[in-house]
């Protein structure tokens, strides 16, 4: 009886989803499985990447980074932590969301 009550209780709980409602059309998502995943979202004008990326090495590339993410969806809600010179020219700034940066990179 206790198991049935527990199952009924668990079934009534809301399901949490960390997915973000976002149009990924025209974007390439890359992941390399390492201890922490290496993540890239590439758009037509540049890309955002995880903390593995050094924006100072992005010569003539518009790139920005976010930290502490494990999925592409988390990249969208994370705050941009570093920006290359070319990304700054597109209006991408430290502190904006990953989703805002991706839209400027489309």
Which positions does each model-derived feature cover?
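Residues that scaffold, gate, or flank divalent-cation-dependent active/transport sites
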Residues: 18-106
């Amino acid at each position: 009886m206790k198991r049935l009550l527990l199952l009924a209780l668990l079934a009534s709980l809301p399901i949490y989803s960390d997915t973000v409602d976002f149009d990924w059309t025209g974007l390439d998502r890359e992941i390399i499985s390492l201890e922490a995943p290496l993540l890239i979202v590439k758009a037509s004008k540049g890309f955002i990447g995880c903390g593995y990326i050094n924006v100072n090495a992005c010569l003539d590339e518009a790139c920005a980074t976010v930290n502490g993410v494990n999925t592409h969806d988390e990249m969208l809600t994370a705050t941009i932590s570093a920006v290359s010179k070319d990304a700054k020219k597109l209006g991408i700034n430290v502190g904006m969301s990953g989703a805002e940066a991706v839209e400027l990179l489309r």
